[in-house]
Amino acid sequence: MHNGTAPNGLGTALASIVKTPFGYAKEYFHRRPDPSYAPNFVSGEAKERAGALVEEMRREGIVLLPGYFKQPLLGKLQGALDRAVSGHPDKGNPNAFSNLNSLEADATFYDAALDDFLLEVIGGYYQKRFAVTTASAMRLLPAPSELRTGSFQWHHDTRGRQVHVMVLLSDVTTKGQRMTYLKRSHNTYYNYARSKDGGSRFEVDVVSNPSLKERITEVVGPAGTVAIFDSNGLHSGNRGEGEIRETLTLCYVSWRHFKKVRVKRKDIEALPPQKRQVMEFNPNLVWVD
């Protein structure tokens, strides 16, 4: 995989030479585990299954849980998504609706964001405390598959190691608007030039290298399917004209890259202590009374 200076001009190239060593150092310390931390969200057989998924995720960068959320919760999440995105067209993507403040919009989403088993996997992967930092509900209407802009092209998320959970709230097939992920690309340290703006796009790198095809996995499955992935790995959205795709995407961070997330105080206060700690570890919560 090409990891040199992105074609962003001489200024970016020079900045990359100066800033890359500092970026590598920060990311190295970000990835170091906390030896005093151990996730304790589940026990027994569930803990063993979570541990196996953690090992797979460390190896591949992504794990899939087909049909993980089931009725009646699945129906509640689907209803919450409909309420959250209705009347909210996505300004950055055509034929799409989204709500970046999903937890504020509907408390039902906490049942997915703070699911014990998913938290066990995330905690096992990070090996340190972590918090929810974004929760985005999205509905993609049919659009031409040739649309390859923004997150609908091969890229990494420019913030180093970062765990995302994507919950499919509609059936998604290999012919639909699925996400694709390049397995075993998640441990890369990107230089400064390939961590900023257009430099984080790897569309040409992936498309022009046929040997990578066998490492590409597709996030498909029935509604309720969950993908847990490290967004430092290369991934891409894909548009298509055959299916509507509905998803809830949650981002969890540890130590770095906390973002503002709007939450209702009464919803946080109603959480069990351990789950409340996951939310309140984010110092940038925006409290809405």
Residue ranges and their predicted role:
Residues 2-4, 18-19, 39, 187-289:
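Conserved double-stranded beta-helix
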Residues 147-151, 164-165, 175-182, 190-194, ...:
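A short secondary-structure junction signal
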Residues 80-81, 181-183:
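Short Gly/aromatic-enriched secondary-structure transition segments
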Residues 128-130, 134-136, 150-152, 161-167, ...:
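Generic beta-strand structural signal
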Residues 159-174, 220-221, 228, 251-254:
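Short, conserved beta-strand element in jelly-roll/cupin
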Residues 128, 156, 169-178, 184-186:
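Active-site region of the double-stranded beta-helix
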Residues 69-71, 139-140, 159, 172-174, ...:
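Short, solvent-exposed loop/turn segments at secondary-structure junctions
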Residues 2-60, 64-156, 194:
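Non-heme Fe(II)-dependent double-stranded beta-helix
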